[in-house]
Structures are given as C-alpha cells and as structure tokens.
Amino acid sequence: MDLSRFLDRSRGQCRADVAVEALATGVSTPTVYVLDCDGYYPGFNFLFGLAQPALRTAVVFTARLRGPLFAERLAKEIVHESGHLYGLGHCSNPKCVMYFSNTLLDTDRKTAYFCERCRRKLFARYLNP
C-alpha cells in the first residue's frame, strides 16, 4: 500500500484521521488496518492507533511498537482499536487493553485482554441486547 497519501512530509508522519477516512471506503464490517509508519493526529505528537467507530475503521501504526516485544505490542494495539470499533472507550484500569497508552511503557504494562468492566460492557451490548 502506498502510504504517501497519508504522509505529512513536514513531520515525517502519517496523519491518522486522513488514513482512516481514506481506508474506510467500502468497509462494511469493523476493520483494523496495520500501517508501517509513524502516526499522529493534530494535538498529539504521535499515536499508536486511531479508531473511528462511525466509519467502522481503525489504524494501528507500527513505527513506535518495534523492539523485542513487537508482536505483543501490535496485538494489544489491534485489540485496543477493535474495542473502540465495538463501542468501548478508554478504561481507567492500567492492566486493561482499553487503557490509554501515552507511552510504550503503558502498552507494555497492560495486558492484551479486556478487564471485567469492559467485558461486561461488550457482553451487555452484543450478547444481551
């Protein structure tokens, strides 16, 4: 995929909202795209990912996830953005996958799983309508 259409050359980063909007075309089911670049959104220096539930589309950026824990970090961020696509917000539990990762250490400390509260929200929304 050509990432240049999302790239802000002055920053050397891909703009997250532009990527989501462009990739959302034709999406009918919740979809998370993994992009091999560094992402940002106005007001933030960087993002690990961004979801737009109304568009059923999210992106996860790999640049800052690299290192020996890359696969684990990537999995956590994909699950996190998927949680947003299914209606979850950020969680205050630092071990929950829905906890907002402000740093890579935050991502490393949290698990790849939803906490009990977030699981209940998902079950209530999708299993007990």
Language-model-detected regions and their locations in the chain:
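Metzincin-family zinc-dependent endopeptidase catalytic domain
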Residues: 1-78, 85, 89
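Generic, low-specificity signal for short hydrophobic/alpha-helical stretches with a mild N-terminal bias
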Residues: 42, 80, 97-100
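Metalloprotease/metallohydrolase-associated module, dominated by Zn2+-dependent proteases
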Residues: 47-73, 88-129
